[in-house]
A protein has these predicted regions:
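Short amphipathic alpha-helical interaction/hinge segments
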Residues: 19, 26, 47-54, 98
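A broad, structure-centric signal for solvent-exposed, well-ordered loop/edge residues
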Residues: 8, 12-14, 42, 53, ...
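Basic/aromatic recognition patch in beta-strand/loop cores that engages polyanionic ligands
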Residues: 45-85
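Arg/Lys-rich, positively charged N-terminal/basic patches that mediate binding to nucleic acids
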Residues: 1-38
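Solvent-exposed interaction patches of small proteins and small membrane subunits
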Residues: 6, 27, 31-37, 54-63, ...
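Enriched for short, Lys/Arg-rich terminal
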Residues: 71-75, 79-113
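Solvent-exposed, amphipathic alpha-helical segments
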Residues: 21, 42-45
Length: 113
């Protein structure tokens, strides 16, 4: 069975922001194109193998329903919804992706100390 890929507006905005930062702030348009294309390409496997990505667990070990695939220092975070893979967000591995996904959760991180 092949799954349909659906990109959220937030994911597309994240991708734009990542590319914009690399191109403008880091003055590297070639890297911006390579990184944003690589993040998109990392989701291609999900059409046939949506369970490829690692699961994201909430504190206490509860499955959040999200998974992620990686490209270099970036995560493409997604959910499997019946016959669809919903690509929710793209984040740098240095970001607190739990707070990006669950801003309402009181999650204590090492940065809070």
């Amino acid at each position: 069975m092949k799954y349909k890929i659906n990109y959220s507006p937030e994911f597309l905005n994240d991708l734009f922001q990542i590319g914009d930062y690399i191109e403008i702030q880091l003055h590297n348009p070639a890297a911006a194109d390579r990184i944003t294309s690589g993040i998109m390409d990392s989701t291609d496997i999900l059409v046939e193998y949506p369970e490829t990505g690692a699961k994201i667990f909430l504190p206490g070990g509860l499955d959040s329903g999200y998974r992620f695939v990686t490209f270099e220092d970036y995560l493409a975070i997604y959910q499997i919804r019946f016959n669809e893979v919903y690509i929710a967000r793209a984040v740098n591995v240095r970001q607190d992706y739990m707070r990006v996904l669950f801003p309402w959760l009181q999650i204590r991180s090492d940065h809070d100390e």
